[in-house]
Design a protein with these regions (language model features):
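Extended beta-strand-rich architecture
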Residues: 1-168
Length: 168
């Protein structure tokens, strides 16, 4: 399963209420068949349930401004969002195929050689079935990979100021 369907429902809900620019994200579990998973208090037999983070951008890339023309959100806007989310880790993007995404406008996201998700434009067939004026750009990443990024640590402020003197 995937979180992308839920994001499209939220998008449609907002568009039906005349929202022209939509940016949403979601955290949740997806369900993948895996015969090696045994039943326990936190698992269901035969299903792996990893946490994922997904996001969607639709409409203008920037709010309306008098000095510039309105430009729709594109793949590179959301790719930049994914890079910012993963920073300081260096993500690599390579062309890929995903059933929900446009062929030729989809990329696999890798961090340290490990595939962690996808980013791309919604497939034209799904765009048509959801009756969308333009294609939203979506991403879905493994939450564990996002949480592995190093976070800057706290360093207390020195109690005494440093002193520098020129003794010459």
């Amino acid at each position: 399963s995937t979180l992308l369907g839920s994001l499209l429902q939220v998008l449609k809900f907002n568009l039906d209420r005349k929202a022209e620019r939509v940016r949403v994200f979601e955290l949740g579990r997806v369900f993948l068949r895996d015969a090696s998973v045994k039943s326990s208090d936190t698992t269901v037999e035969g299903f792996h349930q990893p946490m994922r983070v997904a996001g969607l951008a639709y409409g203008a890339a920037q709010p309306l401004q008098w000095g510039s023309k309105e430009q729709g959100v594109d793949f590179f806007d959301v790719k930049g969002d994914v890079e910012a989310l993963l920073a300081p880790l260096q993500a690599q993007f390579e062309p890929a195929e995903h059933p929900a995404m446009h062929p030729g406008r989809c990329a696999r996201v890798r961090v340290a050689g490990r595939e962690i998700g996808y980013v791309g434009e919604l497939h034209p067939r799904w765009r048509q079935s959801w009756d969308l004026q333009q294609a939203p750009v979506l991403f879905e990443l493994e939450l564990d990979a996002v949480l592995q990024r190093p976070v800057p640590g706290f360093r207390p402020v020195a109690k005494h100021q440093s002193v520098q003197r020129d003794l010459a």
